[in-house]
Amino acid sequence: MDWIDNIVSAWTGHRKFAEFLVDKMKPNVIVELGVDYGFSSFVFANALKNQNGIIYGIDLFEGDIHTGIRNTYNSVLNNIKNHNLTKIKIIVGDFTEVSKTWNLPINILHIDGLHTYEAVKNDYENWSKFVEKDGIIIFHDVVAFEEVANFFKEVSGWYKLFFTHSAGLGILTKNIELRNEIINNFSNVYNFEVNPL
């Protein structure tokens, strides 16, 4: 157990998966839509410490109807500074507005903002175009929020995996090798469903 595990988060059960993705994919760019207190951002940043990649955490840091209205910005910055996380860049902004000027290809896109159908759809439509062909998109809370699950079910043209623990994690990739690696490494550890392309 380390300092990251002291952060209360519904994402804690996905830590090993995030570390696996970074180790397997060697991503140059990870984008996280929704930082909150930073658990998943810190996990990715920590996993990147011996690599060249960067995680960009994007958030307004105002909270929302699901998390409650709260400002976590200073807490996130303090953890970045106190734990020397050099592989993370925080962008304070609206997801849609930031996407309008975004110009980097993305290896891992993590969608974990407002959990309404419209918001998740908007995040996907604005950001999935930047994901590289061998990349991956992950949606948190596909079990905890029906509207996230409904949108995830509607997305087509990707291999889908669906973890059921820790509020659920929906996974999209067009990379069959990565899909198979995930199945081989996690089928004995977690319950999940596999859907074809």
Model-found features: residue ranges?
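S-adenosylmethionine/decaboxylated-SAM
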Residues: D2-L197
